[in-house]
Amino acid sequence: MTDPIADYLTRLRNAIGAKHRVVEVPASNLKKEITKILFEKGYILNYKFVEDGPQGTIKVALKYDSVNKVNAIKKLERVSSPGMRKYTGYKDMPRVINGLGIAIISTSKGVMTNKEAAELKIGGEVLCYVY
């Protein structure tokens, strides 16, 4: 697999489209950090790291509105890819839907949202947009 982050986002999108409650994805440190950010920002209900085998898996519980059965995540968009990396400085930090969504940035201080990176005045690689 050439792009594990794109695979992770696609698995989440497919599970949302099929109205699954839980999706299980192969684990990596970067995926764990992205999942933690999605949980902290309220886009997913819960997550659990399961160590089964050399790599392990992440079980992600998706968050749905109780009335309309609409998912909290409207769109997951991969920005930087292995073939075409996209970097940004803190002054040019992307605003996703005028601040309603988040951009997940991989920086020298770890993986964080665009707002956190701008506050710390550090740039990095734009991994994806979530809204």
Curated annotation (Swiss-Prot):
InterPro entries: Ribosomal_uS8, Ribosomal_uS8_CS, Ribosomal_uS8_sf. Keywords: Ribonucleoprotein, Ribosomal protein, RNA-binding, rRNA-binding. One of its GO terms (cellular component) is cytosolic small ribosomal subunit. It holds the Pfam family Ribosomal_S8. It comes from the Bacteria. One of its GO terms (molecular function) is structural constituent of ribosome. One of its GO terms (biological process) is translation. One of the primary rRNA binding proteins, it binds directly to 16S rRNA central domain where it helps coordinate assembly of the platform of the 30S subunit. Part of the 30S ribosomal subunit. Contacts proteins S5 and S12. Belongs to the universal ribosomal protein uS8 family. HAMAP family: Ribosomal_uS8_B (MF_01302_B). This is Small ribosomal subunit protein uS8. It comes from Bacteroides thetaiotaomicron (strain ATCC 29148 / DSM 2079 / JCM 5827 / CCUG 10774 / NCTC 10582 / VPI-5482 / E50). The gene is rpsH.
